[in-house]
């Protein structure tokens, strides 16, 4: 990768995957989805086919169609489109990486395999390297999500020396809660001009203090405009406003968790707040009762109306 890469910063929406009532991907929603993120949330970068998007429950072909639709409708509108290509099979990940390059994605990301797990950081780096080699001109971001993968490796150990093996490596989507490990990632990335994006939405303020460059999350699909205010307040040194916004955000998430806040609930909340038909989740996730999502949406409305 020879050309200079535009650094990935700010808010990145981890997109949901719209499905029809029959459980098929619904590409007709994507164009309006792009406009909603930009016009209503002021969020101009996306992370497609990740956890929020139920990527690991989709077929390779479905993931290709979704990525292509986001590229098609986001062209000239979105600042950056990162495609998650992680799979249990390295061959599938490589195929998705090549496809992402062919459609003009701005970068790719890969999560650790979680059935046959890498036994150490060297093994995981090798996996990332072989996926990246299928799209060597695309920036590569490691997706660290130990809570879902069960891979108990520290991200800082994975990053150590990775630039010597993967010239296109550009950073990490850190979706763990270990702030010490996160801080080490930020420290290591500083001299390399990489991006460290935080992925635990309700703890963003702590990550900002450590120096992360932005955040990737599901709630930025419908609370991005509020979190953008928080980022502005933080960057302007208004720590009281930043903290108050974070506390309000935490209150919403805490309320949602009392009702059970998994991907299926979050997806229905997105439908309620945005008006876009996200549809049901894919099994084994079960549909969310509308009343539960409406209660969370009302909590979000109350929070945002006071700002």
UniProtKB/Swiss-Prot annotation:
Q: Name one GO molecular function term.
A: N-acetylneuraminate lyase activity
- What is its pathway? Amino-sugar metabolism; N-acetylneuraminate degradation
E.C. numbers? 4.1.3.3
- List cellular component terms (GO): cytoplasm
Q: Where in the cell is it found?
A: Cytoplasm
Matching Pfam families, A to Z? DHDPS
Q: What is its main location?
A: cytoplasm
Annotated keywords: Carbohydrate metabolism, Cytoplasm, Lyase, Schiff base
Q: What class of enzyme is it?
A: lyase
Which example biological process does GO assign this protein? Answer: N-acetylneuraminate catabolic process
SS bond partners = none
Its annotated function is as follows:
Catalyzes the cleavage of N-acetylneuraminic acid (sialic acid) to form pyruvate and N-acetylmannosamine via a Schiff base intermediate. It prevents sialic acids from being recycled and returning to the cell surface. Involved in the N-glycolylneuraminic acid (Neu5Gc) degradation pathway.
| Protein name per the record | N-acetylneuraminate lyase
Underlying gene = npl
